[in-house]
């Protein structure tokens, strides 16, 4: 089950529903609720009730380290006790991603890194730097 937890980007929920439909995965959302922590807790309860064994919570993207949003993502972690936390980064972000990855890892102790847009012309320097700084695997 995919969970639409990005309440900040206007089209995020609809976009996740389209993706879920395209790949045949159920998407849970609550368009009336603007509290990502509450959304995550309700979605986990729904997933358990329906017998899902995998839940992916899509949260708001954070291009820079914003303390309020960092606290929010930590609250989601504490509320749902995930088995795995992945730091997803646009491979075209460059070296700025290293500082963001370090801040996220310090706050969340994530399990690995997922790089998007690798089909572009980036050379992967940020990936190697992130791997070195946070000492977490790059997931494929």
Where are each of the predicted segments found?
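P-loop/Walker A NTP-binding module and the surrounding RecA-like catalytic core of P-loop NTPases
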Residues: 1-140
């Amino acid at each position: 089950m995919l969970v639409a937890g990005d309440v900040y980007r206007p089209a995020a929920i609809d976009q996740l529903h389209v993706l879920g439909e395209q790949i045949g995965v159920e998407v849970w959302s609550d368009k009336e609720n603007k509290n990502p922590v509450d959304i995550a807790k309700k979605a986990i309860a729904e997933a358990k009730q329906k017998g899902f064994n995998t839940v992916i919570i899509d949260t708001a993207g954070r291009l820079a380290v914003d303390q309020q949003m960092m606290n929010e993502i930590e609250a989601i972690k504490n509320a749902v006790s995930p088995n795995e936390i992945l730091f997803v980064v646009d491979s075209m972000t460059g070296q700025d991603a290293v500082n963001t990855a370090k801040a996220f890892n310090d706050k969340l102790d994530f399990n690995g890194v997922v790089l998007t847009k690798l089909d572009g012309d980036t050379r992967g320097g940020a990936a190697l730097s992130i791997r070195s700084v946070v000492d977490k695997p790059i997931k494929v």
